[in-house]
Design a protein with these regions (language model features):
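Long, charge-rich C-terminal accessory regions
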Residues: 119-174
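Conserved GNAT acetyl-CoA-binding A-motif
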Residues: 47-57, 80-96, 106, 153-157
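Glycine-rich acetyl-CoA-binding "A-motif" of GNAT/NAT acetyltransferases
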Residues: 2-4
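Conserved acetyl-CoA-binding loop-helix of GNAT-fold acetyltransferases
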Residues: 37-39, 56-59, 64-80
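Conserved acyl-donor/pantetheine-binding loop and adjacent beta-alpha core of acyl/acetyltransferases
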Residues: 10-56, 115, 120-128
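Short hydrophobic beta-strand segments that form the core of ligand-binding sensory/regulatory domains
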Residues: 7
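Alpha-helix-centered segments that form part of catalytic cores
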Residues: 35-60, 136-156
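Glycine- and acidic-residue-rich phosphate-binding/metal-coordinating active-site segment common to enzymes
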Residues: 72-75, 85-126
Length: 174
């Protein structure tokens, strides 16, 4: 009986650009009006060189606890250490963000409406196939977070409920 699985994806970005958003602060000021302000912004970043991604980690709820999730996670590093020639030098871990009751990204639902027709695609499905349309269609300059819907603002950088244990484990290892 299989109760858990973890995965490693190699050469991500080898056949096309991978994209992600980075949240940061943008400071603005005016000597004339004598003010300084710090704004929350997100900016699209493209990764063109291949990298290895720590992928799926799933453990059946009946078997969670007692370090089993950590074992599944760390097994990936052991595997990479045994066969380093199979993996890229850069290793990335992506944590899935918050989703609604229909399993759609809350952030993407609110952000993408400025650039795409909602009926155009199911974003999760098409982005796993090829997300280059994102880097082709979205401007490269920073976007203010404040115009986004409040629910979208609150969940930027917050992991999906099912990913919280993995997120905490990675943060503790950093």
């Amino acid at each position: 009986r299989i109760v858990g699985i973890s995965a490693i994806y190699t050469s991500v970005s080898k056949n096309g650009t991978s994209v992600f958003f980075k949240r940061k602060k943008k400071n603005i000021s005016s000597k004339v009006f004598k003010f300084k302000k710090s704004l929350d912004v997100i900016q699209l970043h493209a990764v063109k060189e291949p990298y290895t991604e720590l992928g799926t980690l799933f453990l059946h709820p009946d078997f969670r606890g007692k370090g089993r999730g950590s074992l599944l996670s760390l097994a990936r590093f052991k595997f990479m250490a045994l066969w380093p020639e199979r993996f890229d030098k850069k290793v990335v871990a992506e944590i899935r963000g918050k989703v609604d009751k229909d399993d759609n990204s809350i952030f993407w639902k609110h952000f993408s409406k400025y650039f795409f027709d909602e009926e155009m695609f199911n974003n999760n499905e098409i982005s796993y196939i090829n997300n280059s349309f994102i880097s082709e269609s979205i401007p490269k300059h920073p976007f203010l977070v404040s115009p986004l819907n409040r629910s979208a603002q609150r969940i930027i950088g917050i992991p999906n409920d099912n990913a919280v244990p993995a997120f905490k484990m990675m943060r503790s290892q950093n």
